[in-house]
Swiss-Prot record:
Organism expressing this protein natively: Thermotoga maritima (strain ATCC 43589 / DSM 3109 / JCM 10099 / NBRC 100826 / MSB8)
Protein name, per record: 5'-nucleotidase SurE
Protein purpose: Nucleotidase that preferentially dephosphorylates 5'-GMP and 5'-AMP.
Subunit structure: Homodimer and possibly homotetramer.
Cofactor note: Binds 1 Mg(2+) ion per subunit. In contrast to other surE homologs, is essentially inactive with other divalent cations.
GO CC entries: cytoplasm
């Protein structure tokens, strides 16, 4: 397959290098990734300033470019410029830390894959769910095995897979729902050496979903969480209720 690999941790990150090198053992791999950390940039794109792209070296088997853009920019550039619109699969990752619950709305990793889904290209976001001790190689090897088994024709149009891999021994995988996992944010006030106040966002994770088949519970129990998601955000149940009342 011709595979595009991107991420939001930057082209220098270990996660994308390990993933690209392992995938290139069996596939034709192209890497187009941000030239610096772009975590939590969501699905932002660059439209008011130029995008710069520079060829870089990862390995002999991988064609790689860094860009000044976001993960979504990287996918657009790669598809239209680097790969001449011939892409069989897009993989975003391996991310350092989980992308579960409401995190996916902020995640550049997920948005890179979602950009591919919006083009109706098979796309996967993959994260090593342990931020402090990420197992990039374990996540990448899981993905390689998964690709040999999974039938992408089972996915609805414009749908991607969000994969979170636990650290340590993997018991198997589960197809899961996006959870209600979210953050309770607060801001720490600090003072610069020049006497100016600034703020640093902090937070505590909230995991209170009462459903059993959600992403973080699978990971907590040692299973890889695989969640099919799409860019269509309409709340269908609420829409039906509103129409019944007001139409």
């Amino acid at each position: 397959m011709r595979i595009l690999v991107t991420n939001d941790d930057g082209i220098q990150s270990k996660g994308i290098i390990v993933l690209a090198e392992l995938l290139s053992e069996e596939h034709e791999v192209f890497v187009v990734a941000p030239d610096k950390e772009r975590s939590a940039t969501g699905h932002s794109i660059t439209i008011h300033v130029p995008l710069w792209m520079k060829k870089v070296f990862i390995s002999e088997r991988v064609v790689a470019y860094s860009t000044t853009g976001t993960p979504a920019d990287c996918v657009k550039l790669a598809y239209n410029v680097v790969m001449d619109k011939r892409v069989d699969l897009i993989v975003s990752g391996v991310n350092r830390g989980p992308n579960m619950g409401m995190d996916i709305l902020h995640s550049g990793t997920v948005s890179g894959a979602m950009e591919g889904a919006m083009m109706n290209i098979p796309s996967i976001a993959i994260s090593s769910a342990n931020y402090e001790s990420p197992d990039f190689e374990g996540a990448a090897r899981f993905l390689i095995d998964f690709l040999k088994e999974f039938d992408f024709s089972l996915l609805d149009p414009f749908t991607m897979l969000n994969i979170n891999v636990p650290a340590g021994e993997i018991k198997g995988w589960r197809f899961t729902r996006q959870s209600r996992r979210r953050w309770n944010d607060y801001f720490e006030e600090r003072v610069s050496p020049f006497g100016e106040k600034y703020y640093w966002m902090m937070g505590e994770v909230i995991e209170d979903d009462d459903r059993d088949d959600v992403d973080y519970k699978a990971v907590r129990e040692g299973y890889v969480s695989i969640t099919p998601i799409h860019p269509f955000l309409t709340n269908e149940q609420c829409l039906k209720k509103l129409r019944e009342v007001y139409d």
